[in-house]
Amino acid sequence: MVVAIIGILSAIGTLTYSGYVKAAKRSSAENIMQQVSLAQTEEYSLTGEYWRSGAQDTTTCSANDKDASIALEAALFSGKEVITKSDSGFNMCIFGSASDYTIKAENADGCVLQLPRNGIVDAGNDKC
């Protein structure tokens, strides 16, 4: 009986801890997205347009590997590893136009977060 109770408590504790870690990583990703947004404001004030990933994507971008994050860091943070050295587990990219943008973050579990230029972070699916 005691062993069963300890087993149940262990299972509950593991699930609770996993949920806590997942929430902490998402919060970290959201904070980094806000930093990217600030860097975009500086980019716009210097060049008159916002930076976008890849081939000047306007409707979406792929954030499922580190290449997009590395390109973003090179363009907006002078290569400083703001995204790739974080413990968030998310990669990021940016899509939009010269006058508007959306920051997209994605992790290996398929959680997709999006932050439009003048909005709040939106979990694009139920995997977050």
Model-derived segments and spans:
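N-terminal single-pass transmembrane signal-anchor helix
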Residues: 1-17, 21
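Generic signature of intrinsically disordered, low-complexity, basic-rich segments
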Residues: 7, 19-23, 64-67, 71
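Generic detector of isolated residues embedded in canonical secondary-structure elements
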Residues: 16, 35, 102-104
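Periplasmic/extracellular, small/polar-rich flexible segments of pilin-like filament-forming proteins
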Residues: 42-128
